Amino acid sequence: MKKSFLFAALVAIMCAFSSCVNEPTILGKWQMNTMKMQSIVNGQVVQTVEEPVPSEDPIYWQFVDESTGKIIEYFDGDVWTDEFTYTLNDNILTITPRESSDISITCQVLNLTETELSLTQIPEGESEYYHQMTYNFTRVTE
């Protein structure tokens, strides 16, 4: 009886560990491929513009988990900055400047695999007219 209980406990621990290991992670470096902007008026999409990010002017986001807090590094073609922190809970990504926590960008994670990340910005408050941004990334492996 004791052996079967220990075996069952070991199997449960191994199953729990393997399910955690196999889940994709947002940590790492991502290159933005496309940006899509939808203009929305009274709940209706009135215009959609989707453009690739030029390879000669790349945009990177790098998600870093440091002991002092989660940092997002951003590269806009000229310089890396690490002025932002992030949280990721229940497929909701919130990005906040380190210096001003009263301003933030909130996105829903539409897709997260080992190689792809898609985010759509959640509009703040209710408005008759707003732009909804969607970003698509691929993981950079070096």
Predicted regions and their residues:
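Sec-dependent bacterial lipoprotein signal peptides
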Residues: 1-19
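Lipid interaction determinants
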Residues: 20-83, 89-142
